[in-house]
């Protein structure tokens, strides 16, 4: 499973570690992804999404039904 948030589309990005001597070594910044089950009231079932914590805040704000409708409009299987 890829490290991509299903709601926001956040992906890993690449940058540098910096030591005290300012030496640069490449590293990846990973999104804070969580597997989370959300209850869909109108379908009477749970859906499991891989979302970032920012995505969870968006779901809290908009509502899970609206977010799932947007995912389905994009063609994602939910």
Curated annotation (Swiss-Prot):
Top-level division of the source organism's lineage: Bacteria
Region spans: Disordered: 1-21
InterPro entries: Ribosomal_bL28, Ribosomal_bL28/bL31-like_sf, Ribosomal_bL28_bact-type, Ribosomal_bL28_sf
GO MF annotation terms: structural constituent of ribosome
Family matches, as Pfam families: Ribosomal_L28
Keywords, comma-separated and alphabetical: Ribonucleoprotein, Ribosomal protein
SUPFAM superfamilies reported for this sequence: L28p-like
Any single GO BP term: translation
Coiled-coil ranges per UniProt: none
Keyword Ribosomal protein: yes
GO cellular component: cytosolic large ribosomal subunit
Family, similarity comment: Belongs to the bacterial ribosomal protein bL28 family.
Record PANTHER family: 39S RIBOSOMAL PROTEIN L28, MITOCHONDRIAL, LARGE RIBOSOMAL SUBUNIT PROTEIN BL28M
Name used for this protein in its record: Large ribosomal subunit protein bL28
Gene: rpmB
């Amino acid at each position: 499973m890829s490290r991509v948030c299903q709601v926001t589309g956040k992906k890993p990005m690449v940058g540098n570690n910096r030591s005290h001597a300012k030496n640069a070594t490449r590293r990846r910044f990973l999104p804070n992804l969580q597997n989370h089950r959300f209850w869909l009231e109108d379908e009477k079932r749970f859906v499991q999404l891989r979302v970032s914590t920012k995505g969870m805040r968006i779901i809290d704000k908009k509502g899970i039904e609206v977010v799932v409708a947007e995912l389905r409009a994009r063609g994602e299987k939910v």
